[in-house]
Amino acid sequence: MTVAAIILAASPEGALRAIDSRPLVRRLAEAAWSGGGVPVVVVAADPDGAVAAALAGAQVTLAEPAPREAGPVAQICRGIDVARGLVTETEAAVVWPARMAWVDPETLTSLIEAHGTDPEPVIRPAFEGTPGWPVLLPVAHLEALRALRPDRMPDELLDDLAAAGVPFRTLEVGDPGTTHDLATEREDLPPYAGPPEPASGHAHEWGSVAAETADDAPLPGPTIAPWEPAPGR
């Protein structure tokens, strides 16, 4: 089972925003890789190479965005198309807006494990009953997503998919990072609880990486992946 992680940065400035002295996009790429996303694709404009430099040494593919006028739906589809070009066996993608900076890698793992036992629905994480992001989208629903209007924002796109009959599932993960974005400082987040029970029946060995791991602690093994621009939507 191969599940990609698609990180969506709205601008180079947002991608490079310093979070505890590290570029946001680097933090997210490492979290996605640690949580089991393969491949990890970052969709971000990079006019001067600064985003690529921030990702150097990470196991990640940097993809040129679709045209801005094509809307959020095209950016999501762009990332998934690139992931499928890299790994044709990709079955699903975790769509991760970069503003959701505090998501724990365990949440990604929980989404992937849940997809393994229940592969049909779109899976949305929840914290204390409130649905959030990132969202796991099976590629079987990619064309339904691609058909949606370019003026729809990410939450509205999910509503449109549900209205079109795409099945959804909400997964409680106990991660405040799924519902609190960069408008909330990390020290102001509610306590991390973790999932009430593992999706696959076994406990993960890590805890809240956002709360317990030093931000300058490197992850082993990542290298920058080559990439080629794919056609926009």
Please report, for each region that a protein language model flagged, where it lies by residue:
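N-terminal glycine-rich phosphate-binding loop and ensuing alpha1 helix
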Residues: 1-49, 232
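Structural element of the ATP-grasp superfamily
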Residues: 25, 142, 154-158
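Short beta-strand segments
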Residues: 7-9, 96-97, 125-126, 171-174
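Alpha-helical structural signal in soluble globular domains
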Residues: 31, 35, 53-58, 82, ...
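Short, surface-exposed acidic-centric catalytic microdomains
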Residues: 33, 41-78
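Conserved alpha/beta core of the MobA/IspD/sugar-nucleotide pyrophosphorylase nucleotidyltransferase superfamily
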Residues: 149-233
